[in-house]
Amino acid sequence: MLHRIPAFLRPRPFSGLPLSCGNRDVSVAVLPAAQSGAVRTENNIQRHFCTSRSICSKKVDQSVPANEISQKAAESQGRGKETLKKDLLDIIKDMKVDLSTANVKTPKPRGRKPSASLEATVDRLQKAPEDPPKKRNEFLSPELVAAASAVADSLPFDKQTTKSELLRQLQQHEEELRAQKDREKRRISFTHIISNMKIAKSPSGRASTRPQHQIQFDEDMDSSLKQEKPTDFRKRKYLFKGKRLSIFADKAFADEPPEPEASPSLWEIEFAKQLASVADQPFENGFEEMIQWTKEGKLWEFPVNNEAGLDDDGSEFHEHIFLDKYLEDFPKQGPIRLFMELVTCGLSKNPYLSVKQKVEHIEWFRNYFNEKRDILKENNIAFT
């Protein structure tokens, strides 16, 4: 409660010192400012009407003119309009609304009228072309429609208009999403079609430019040609099934003897041995050493054979032993006959020489005695 100011009380001059709440001098100190036409500021109101008994230490601001206060009020009102417009646009842009808000209705404030900016926004939204309800709600789920109606009921505007605008915004996003999906499907289907495309070929095929009288070989043997050929080129043409031209004689090719296989020369054998010696490595175990000794002839080959290493010339056993038939040209008696019998006896007991080598050995002695015939006559030795 403010105390009344008596008429006879002389007001004191205004001082810059703060005054406590409930003091009688407060009203008296304010009178000079009121008489001069100044308006109370927010600081003065806060200083005079306080609930605490402590002394306010804030400095008293100077009185503000009325035109500056009106400018501040206009700016605050403009900011309020912008914030309200921004809040409305944020509500419209939000698409995801919980279903729990569908049955909740916020009480509308009584006696509150929408501002001019909100009315202008609503009018602008009403003038926007609206889609038919069936087409608009075609792709929207009933949950989104119920959520949009709940949001429209919670706003202090026309319910149908707000609901239609929310559904239109949701429908726009849904159409953009479906258009993007359609583009992806179209791209996938196009690449799938291109990958499965095949070049169509005419069934007739290209005519062959090769003359008919020319011999045609089988061209399907080429492994690099893996593509399927038309039906006209699949027929194989063999060289020996056609009509004979009778150009070459058959006997000329049939009488040719087969070429004998040339045996490797001494130099080739020696070169192979050198290569083998270069590639030889030290033995890893005793078995490899025994194998090498067997190849060199130092060990018997298994299974053990008495004739191992001997060249079999196809001769029989008696041809190695009975060699008397090769002594017909030698004398029937005398020292030469005795010597040749000893030679044949030694050759028959030699298992390392072949029959051919034994015969050559006897022939060498025959030729030797024929060359020394003159010497034998001088010594009275008969060779015949």
From Swiss-Prot:
Protein name from the UniProt record: Small ribosomal subunit protein mS31
Subcellular compartments: Mitochondrion
Keyword DNA-binding: no
InterPro entries on file: MRP-S31 (IPR026299)
Assigned GO CC terms: mitochondrial inner membrane; mitochondrial small ribosomal subunit; mitochondrion; nucleolus
UniProt gene name: Mrps31
Molecular functions (GO terms): protein domain specific binding; structural constituent of ribosome
Transit peptide location: 1-54
Assembly and binders: Component of the mitochondrial ribosome small subunit (28S) which comprises a 12S rRNA and about 30 distinct proteins.
Record key words, sorted: Mitochondrion, Ribonucleoprotein, Ribosomal protein, Transit peptide
Originating species: Mus musculus
Cross-referenced Pfam families: MRP-S31 (PF15433)
Region (Disordered): 101-136
Highest taxon, organism lineage: Eukaryota
BP-aspect Gene Ontology terms: mitochondrial translation
Biased composition annotated in UniProt, kind: Basic and acidic residues: 121-136
Family statement drawn from the similarity comment of this UniProt entry: Belongs to the mitochondrion-specific ribosomal protein mS31 family.
Segment forming the signal sequence: none
